[in-house]
Amino acid sequence: MKEIKLKGGLNVPLFGSVEKFIVEDLEPKFIGILSEDYFGLKPKFLVSEGDQVRVGQPILEDKTNQGFKIVSPVSGVISSVNRGEKRALISVEIENDKKNSLFELNISGDIGEDLNNAGLWDSFRERPFDRVPNINSKPNYIFVNSCRKDPLELNPNLII
């Protein structure tokens, strides 16, 4: 086996740029919630296959991070729950009914709890392993990345 050592990184020559347009009214027929987006997730299902869900309704709760909820991004019917080896969760598919009926939230006044109930807690990432933080943890610092510099990244001025 040949060993390759790189010093100073690798410069990949990428040419071109991202097209500057926004697709309006893109509503797919099926939405998937993938377990690979949540490292270490031990899911507890709050709904089952065939259940009707609304936007913001909790679908899964993490057993290891008590209280962390994953909510439905669309309204519709849970069409399938896909499992792999040892019944590990692979994905949850939701058939979009395109009605976008909302799940009613109770605002408690606690910012962390309200973010979790709204399904926004998974937007936070804990360093250095890029995991969803524990619900009860209090951060020492918060880093806000307002502009990514990855190759072929979308221009933030177009979005704003």
Spans of features found by a protein language model:
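Buried, small/hydrophobic-residue-enriched core segments of structured protein domains
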Residues: 82-160
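Glycine-/proline-rich flexible loop or hinge segments
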Residues: 55-63, 98-101
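Generic structural motif
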Residues: 37-41, 53-56, 65-80
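Short, solvent-exposed cationic patches
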Residues: 24-27, 77-82
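N-terminal, Lys/Arg-enriched amphipathic/low-complexity engagement segments
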Residues: 1-46, 61
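Short, Lys/Arg- and Gly-enriched loop/turn segments at beta-strand edges
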Residues: 62-73, 87-90, 102
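Acidic, glycine-anchored pre-beta loop/turn
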Residues: 47-53, 82-85
